[in-house]
């Protein structure tokens, strides 16, 4: 991560504690419902992943507002890297309590990395340690939620077989990381608004659910996969429509660019 220009504390209508509660409670409830419900309802894991994505995107927004520069994409990938380690460790030793163990481990990893970033690298961001804890935990919940969508449960053996061994973990890494890093990266600037940024996070989380739903077809069958994708498409459409409305609210003008001029017209 590289430091960008000078920045400051991000402002927004939704307090961090509220969004954190949404991410933790919504994420865990979705993951556990997806685990214990029949495979046709594994989309609950995706709903939990969306809640965690919103939490992670807000944490990125708050820490990146201090001036991360090109570190905005990097911190999103870092979140999922920490998330994979914490999620697999938690599931391997925690059994039914695996997701909770994973969050605790993620918080420890995030705290250590945040302290190194501030104390050793010298980034000097006041909320770095706290933000890295949040981002690490959010990334872990995203990994767990999307794994439940694909595998139908968070049983360690099932996740290893249906998510890790076949390479879908790399897919989750990319789509989950994009959901956390992209919203602020696409919205940053003096006119950035919290609600618009977080609505984009919902949209990206829904796309992740659609893709994970498609991947689940190899294990859960076409009916369950179709339901996963349908839920994702509905959420995506609603979030996209709302995000576009927020863009029009904040933009000075929305105009059509028309066709690109021909070479003759440019002469």
From Swiss-Prot:
The keyword Membrane applies. GO terms for cellular component: plasma membrane. The chain crosses the membrane at residues 19-39, 75-95, 97-117, 140-160, 162-182, 198-218, 221-241. Its EC number is 7.2.1.4. It is a multi-pass membrane protein. It is found in: Cell membrane. InterPro entries: THM_MeTrfase_su_C. One of its GO terms (biological process) is one-carbon metabolic process. Pathway: One-carbon metabolism; methanogenesis from CO(2); methyl-coenzyme M from 5,10-methylene-5,6,7,8-tetrahydromethanopterin: step 2/2. Disulfide bonds: none annotated. Keywords: Cell membrane, Membrane, Methanogenesis, Methyltransferase, One-carbon metabolism, Transferase, Translocase, Transmembrane, Transmembrane helix. Its main location: membrane. GO terms for molecular function: tetrahydromethanopterin S-methyltransferase activity. Pfam families: MtrC. The complex is composed of 8 subunits; MtrA, MtrB, MtrC, MtrD, MtrE, MtrF, MtrG and MtrH. Belongs to the MtrC family. Part of a complex that catalyzes the formation of methyl-coenzyme M and tetrahydromethanopterin from coenzyme M and methyl-tetrahydromethanopterin. This is an energy-conserving, sodium-ion translocating step. This is Tetrahydromethanopterin S-methyltransferase subunit C. The lineage of its organism: Archaea, Methanobacteriati, Methanobacteriota, Stenosarchaea group, Methanomicrobia. The gene is mtrC.
């Amino acid at each position: 991560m590289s430091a960008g220009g000078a920045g400051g504390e991000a402002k927004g209508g939704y307090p961090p504690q509220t969004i954190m509660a949404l991410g933790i409670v919504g994420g865990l409830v979705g993951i556990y419902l997806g685990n214990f419900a029949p495979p046709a309802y594994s989309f609950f894991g995706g709903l939990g992943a969306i809640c965690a994505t919103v939490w992670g995107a807000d944490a990125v927004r708050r820490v990146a507002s201090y001036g991360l520069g090109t570190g905005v994409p990097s911190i999103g990938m870092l979140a999922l890297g920490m998330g994979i380690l914490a999620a697999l460790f938690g599931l391997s030793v925690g059994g039914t309590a695996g997701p909770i163990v994973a969050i605790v481990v993620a918080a420890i990893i995030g705290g250590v990395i945040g302290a190194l970033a501030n104390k050793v690298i010298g980034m000097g961001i006041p909320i770095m340690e706290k933000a890295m804890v949040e981002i690490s935990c959010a990334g872990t919940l995203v990994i767990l939620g999307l794994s439940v969508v694909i595998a139908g449960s968070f049983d360690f053996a099932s996740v290893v077989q249906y998510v890790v061994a076949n390479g879908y973990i790399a897919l989750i890494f990319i789509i989950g990381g994009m959901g956390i890093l992209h919203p602020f990266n696409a919205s940053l600037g003096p006119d950035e608004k919290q609600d618009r940024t977080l609505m984009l996070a919902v949209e990206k989380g829904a796309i992740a659910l659609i893709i994970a739903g498609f991947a689940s077809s190899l294990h859960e069958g076409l009916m369950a996969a179709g339901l996963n994708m349908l839920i994702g498409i509905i959420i995506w459409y609603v979030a996209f429509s709302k995000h576009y409305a927020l863009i029009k609210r904040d933009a000075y003008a929305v105009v059509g660019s028309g066709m690109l001029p021909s070479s003759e017209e440019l002469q």
